[in-house]
Design a protein with these regions (language model features):
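Catalytic machinery of carbohydrate-active enzymes
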Residues: 1-241
Length: 241
């Protein structure tokens, strides 16, 4: 068994999808650690891989305790992230993940694969009773993460007027992939830098806007520096509302 542990935000799982698919092989047996709140999304992401198993762990200490308990002779592990070295040049978080394993960052896009459930997506889409054009917005008006500096609410003045706005609704689903059809059919997609932005980037859509917040701790992970081949994000910088 090879145990895989990585940074555990949902956006990190999108960043590392192509990396993990590059590192594993069909003859191995793998177990990926995942937070309970992201389990449904990550299980669907890798549901095409019969040799991928999952263990729920919410902190790195839980991962360490679990490995100490179950690790056997002959087992191995893949660590993605943690103990970031000084590369001598500026690198984003996702570049660090790939450089750490000597994998080309282009594999983030070239090797990305996520299984979609079109029936689930359609059922979810129909909940919004859409009869007109709309834009899709993901921001965060209630961010209470201790490492963040308050909510990142997209200023409505930066959004098109006279069009329906559909925002991500907390707790309406535990599976981010349910939103795929809703995102694909939007006239525009506006996101803060987040798991929705990373997923949308990898879906290779058009009409995309990334709202970057200079005070955000994730500012060095900016999407639009690396996606010139695929999704054409337009950058909008705005301080917290």
């Amino acid at each position: 068994m090879t145990y895989i542990y990585q940074h555990m935000g949902l956006g990190d799982f999108f960043m590392c999808n192509g990396l993990i698919r590059t590192l594993i092989n069909e003859n191995g047996e793998y177990t990926l650690f995942v937070k309970n709140i992201y389990e449904d999304s990550v299980r669907q992401m890798y549901s095409d891989l019969p040799n991928m198993n999952f263990i729920v762990a919410n902190t790195i200490s839980e991962i360490a305790d679990t490995l100490h308990r179950i690790f056997k002779p002959g087992d191995s592990h893949i660590c993605i992230g943690y103990n970031r070295p000084n590369f001598g040049i500026p690198v984003t978080t996702e570049e660090w993940f790939y450089f750490q394993h000597n994998i080309d960052i282009e594999n983030k896009w070239n090797k990305f694969k996520a299984v979609r459930n079109k029936d689930r997506e359609l059922d979810f889409f129909n909940k919004f009773n859409i009869k007109e054009d709309y834009i899709f917005v993901h921001d965060d008006d209630e961010d209470t993460h201790p490492e963040h500096r308050g909510p990142k609410k997209i200023d409505d003045s930066l959004l098109p007027s006279n069009i329906r706005i559909i925002r991500v609704t907390p707790n309406i689903t535990n599976n981010i992939f349910d939103y795929c059809l809703l995102i694909e059919n939007a006239k525009e997609v506006h996101c803060i830098e987040s798991c929705f932005a990373y997923m949308t980037d990898l879906l290779n859509l058009n009409g995309l806007y990334i709202h970057e917040y200079p005070e955000s701790p994730s500012k060095n992970d900016g999407l639009n520096d690396r996606n010139d081949k695929l999704a054409d994000w337009k950058n909008l910088i705005k301080k917290y509302k």
